[in-house]
């Protein structure tokens, strides 16, 4: 057992928000997270608003939290933000049993996930850097 890995430090032009213990499998959540990765935040919010996935509302709420963190805590321009990172991690797994025939039972696993969204301020292409 080595030393615990230090969390990644945010740069000055970044802000993040984390949603923990979401009741959805990491595989399903990653489908929605990959949909917004690398997009401007306005386009990502529009995609999440009209997505038919059940978890899209929670992902939208987390993205709005990251945008609010960027604006209020880091003084970043909301119009120049992109979704730099959107990654999913495994959380706990609830175990339940399902009654089967002939007196047997089988296990049902109900997975949970963590979601982390990092937004980054980028310079507009028309501006001088």
Swiss-Prot record:
Q: Name one GO biological process term.
A: translation
Q: Which gene encodes it?
A: rplV
- From what organism does this protein derive? Brucella suis biovar 1 (strain 1330)
A Pfam family this protein belongs to? Ribosomal_L22
Similarity-based family: Belongs to the universal ribosomal protein uL22 family.
> What is the name listed in the Swiss-Prot or TrEMBL entry for this protein?
Large ribosomal subunit protein uL22
Keywords in alphabetical order: Ribonucleoprotein, Ribosomal protein, RNA-binding, rRNA-binding
Among Gene3D superfamilies, the record links this protein to: Ribosomal protein L22/L17
Q: Does the keyword S-adenosyl-L-methionine apply?
A: no
User: What NCBIfam families does UniProt report for this protein, alphabetically?
Assistant: rplV_bact
Q: Which residues form the signal peptide?
A: none
